[in-house]
Structure formats: C-alpha cells, structure tokens
Amino acid sequence: MKASLLSKLDILQDRFEELTALLGDAEVISDQAKFRAYSKEYAEVEPIVATYKQVLKVQADLEGAQALLKDNDPDLREMAAEEVREAKEQLAELESSLQRMLLPKDPNDGRNVFLEIRAGTGGDEAAIFSGDLFRMYSRYAERRGWRLEILSENEGEHGGYKEVIARVEGESVYGKLKFESGAHRVQRVPATESQGRIHTSACTVAVLPEPDEQEAIEINPADLRIDTYRSSGAGGQHVNKTDSAIRITHIPSGIVVECQEERSQHKNRARAMSWLSAKLNDQQTSAAANAIASERKLLVGSGDRSERIRTYNFPQGRVTDHRINLTLYSLDEILAGGVEAVIEPLLAEYQADQLAALGE
C-alpha cells in the first residue's frame, strides 16, 4: 500500500484508541449528544481498524513464511511456499477491502429522494416513454422495499406523463439512484407509425436528495408566492370540494414546485417545501459537482441533466449506458424493474475511479 494510505490508517488507529477511551468516560456517557456522536464515529472507524490489524498480522505471517523459503529442509521450503502464496492472496483481498473502506462517503447516499421525470423531444412518444421510465423505477422501488408516492403528475394525451414527480423513501435510495440523472433516449416504432419507421424521443430524469430538516436551506417566506388550487389527482369526489393542491414559486430563482396528491393542504405544503429545499440545494451543489467531474474527466457522477446518459433501443432489445460503454440486450427485464443490471456497473465504475483518486 502507498505511504499516504498507511499514514491515514495509523491516524485512524490512534483515533480509534481515543474513541474507545472517550466512550468509557463518565462525562461523555452523561452527555447523550456527545455519546451518540462518538458512538457513530466508533462504528465507522472500528471495521477499518480491525481490517488494518488483520493486514498487519498477515504481513508478519508472510515475512515469516518468506524467511523459511531459504531453509535447508525441502519439505519445509515447500510448506513455506504454500503459506507465502496463501498469505499473498489474503493480503491482496484485505488491502482491496481496506481501500474500499477508506473511500470518501457521500453524505447523501442514505437519503430519500425526489424523482423527477419529464418528457423532452418527441411529443406523445416522449410522454409514453416517461410513463415507461416511471414504471421501471416504481417496480425497482418495490423490489427494494422502498415506498414511492407521487407528488405531482401531468399526464400525456395518449398515455404516460408530460411530467411526473415522486418522492422515494427507503434504505440507501439516493446511493442507488444518484447516477440516473440525465437524458434518457428511446428508439422505437410508435403504435401510430404505419410505415414501421423508428422514432427517437427523449426524457430527462432528475434525482434530488431530500435534505434533513436541520440541513434544509433557510428560505425567506418573503421570497415565496404560494397558490392553492383544486387537485386533479387522486382523491375521488373530495378533490372537488377543497383547494388542497399547493403551488410554491421561489421568486429569486424562479423555481416552481407543485404538490397535489395529498388530500390535506398542510401535507401538500410540507412536501412542496421539502422538494423546493431539495431543488435549491441541488442548484447550489450541482455546479461544484460538475466542476469536479470535469477536472477529473469523470462522466459517471457529473449529474449533468442535459447529458445523454442512456439509450433504450426497442427493435434490438438493447439498453446502452454511454458513460461506461455498457450494452445489455435485456431491455424488457430492465424496464420491468431490473435496472439494477445497469446501476451496479455504474456504481462499480465510480468506485474504481474513487480508488484511483485515493492512490494519487
């Protein structure tokens, strides 16, 4: 391992010993906020230090076995050679595991998200494809045990959505979906096409992490225009009786959010404010993320909404992710919720890039 990594591990080992002492301190135990913070840090550092100790032990075993390779006894040399081989394999696995543990954690990975899907070029066909993408993510959410709720929808004239916004809640939602942001292109023969010509349409997907209440951007109420209107969404006859839908305009940025799916105006307002906070936060962070991605020549992780990231070709049954040159001939399975087949290689590529940066 590189000297820079070893230095980092030595510092972590010292910190681990310090945390162990702190968690046994009566003053810390009596302060719940400090105790929770130190306990969380301990839980993050402990597996790294434990693996590092394993690495040091295997390195010592390897050195001992290598010394025996010079012994006069041929049987002992043969046994030592086998021990050297096994120790080297074990060391490679442990060091790889250790490097992954040292990768910088994205603080947003565990967050819920706001999922925005909008039809782009292609008219009715783009709206229909928006519906296909929304079903794909909905079924993927079901497979992972996530909860998905529609906040706002604008249906297409011939099916699908001109725009659909949903909130997805569950374990590591942003960590899984964060690379889905961008332009998704579809190539297929529309049902109305009599000549059998392939049409190309596009939709944009945006995945925004939902901020915690404590971390939400402070919004000046004077900067907001709040309108209420009658919901056109779910709710049966009730929607005709009250103006429960909410539209919030953030005047300085021009960002508009709408929430119409809840019967309660209060709930719609709370959801809309949370979504607005996510969009304002995204506006602040996306420029920095794009700058980092550009500097390091990254495609995965740039999050550029205008970047064409994926093509779904129906005649060939093909899905191609252009960022990592991944092509899969399993379009039906992916659209049925099997998008993990694309997500996992993207995450692996991103991790490989992080590992390369870690060793720089």
Curated annotation (Swiss-Prot):
InterPro entries named in the record: PCRF (IPR005139), Pep_chain_release_fac_I (IPR000352), Pep_chain_release_fac_I_sf (IPR045853), Prokaryotic/Mito_RF (IPR050057), RF-1 (IPR004373)
Post-translational modifications reported in the UniProt record: Methylated by PrmC. Methylation increases the termination efficiency of RF1.
Subcellular location: Cytoplasm
Main subcellular localisation: cytoplasm
Sequence positions bearing N5-methylglutamine: 237
Signal peptide span: none
UniProt-listed SMART domains: PCRF
Domain of life where this protein originates: Bacteria
Example of a GO MF term: translation release factor activity, codon specific
Keywords: Cytoplasm, Methylation, Protein biosynthesis
GO CC, any one term: cytoplasm
Entry keyword annotation includes Protein biosynthesis: yes
Role played: Peptide chain release factor 1 directs the termination of translation in response to the peptide chain termination codons UAG and UAA.
UniProt record similarity statement: Belongs to the prokaryotic/mitochondrial release factor family.
Protein's UniProt name: Peptide chain release factor 1
Organism this protein belongs to: Pseudomonas fluorescens (strain ATCC BAA-477 / NRRL B-23932 / Pf-5)
